[in-house]
Amino acid sequence: MLAFGLQALAGAAPGSGGRNAPGAADGPRLILISIDGFRWDYLSIYPTPALRRIAESGVRAESMRPVYPSLTFPNHYSIATGLYPAEHGIVHNHFPDEARNRWYHLHDRSSVEDARWYGGEPVWVTAEKNGLVTAAYYFVGTEAAIGGVSPSHWHSFDASVPGGDRVTQVIDWLAWPEARRPRLITLYFEHVDRAGHDFGSGSPELAAAVAQVDANIGRLLDAIEDLGLGDEVYVLVVSDHGQASYVDPEATFVLRDHIDLAGLDVVAGGAYAWIYQEEPDPERARAIRDAINAAWAHGRAVLRD
């Protein structure tokens, strides 16, 4: 791709305390923008003047390969940490922790804000530990004090907040005095992903969502120039995955027609499914794997290890 109300809290120690360390106020600033579900070729399919503006004045990748599974939470946290899901622990948008007998779910505030789910060290934590102020208008992990450290300023995810309001906050952060002005800002737009899920790729609704997000980014770019920050602010636009319309009845696999679901928890979403045993039984796990692989030509079951 292109190269979650408000919680204005001071970063928990050992963070920056909301002020850049001496000598840290100067230097480049990074705005990390994620457009959820923005497929690699949307840049050429749809009118995207703001994104093209970034691409033409900088660098871009022509394609991307998401980590597995190609879902929002695992991929965003991989972007933030540089780790694979098996290493940082966010392996799905919702999944169990068998040791704690608890579930993580992207819509559950208590789990999203619980730092025990998040392994590795996201980039904003590294920055805060080095005395740099960070701010987040949404990004997976920013609502938890990971390693005891939060961004200096962050918002709890609220899909009802318009993209334009999010951009207004980012512009406000950029206008702060240098001592308090964030060196790293994250900004997240879910609108393209939502339109793709609800209406499909190639739909008018998806095109409208792309146009809306692009316009908001264009407004941000103009504000950066108006503030005289064009030479010190870097804008990095990323995505977590793409989407494609796919209909093939033969590819549908009904688990209960092939295995006994008693004693199993099944987490399914999109092209992926996880099967958890309520009581570990390696022999049964292997039998389930083999039964699925024998009956399904369009997918493959593997054991966790």
Descriptions of predicted regions:
Residues M1-A8:
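Bacterial N-terminal signal peptides
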Residues G163-A175, V192-V233:
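A long, amphipathic alpha-helix that forms part
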Residues D26-I31, S57-A61, K129-A135, A179-I185, ...:
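Loop/turn elements at helix/coil->beta-strand transitions in domains of secreted/extracellular proteins
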Residues D41-H88:
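Short, structured active-site-proximal loop/turn typified by the sulfatase FGly-forming signature C/S-X-P-X-R
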Residues D26, E62, H107-D108, R219-D305:
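Secreted, luminal/periplasmic, and some membrane-associated catalytic domains
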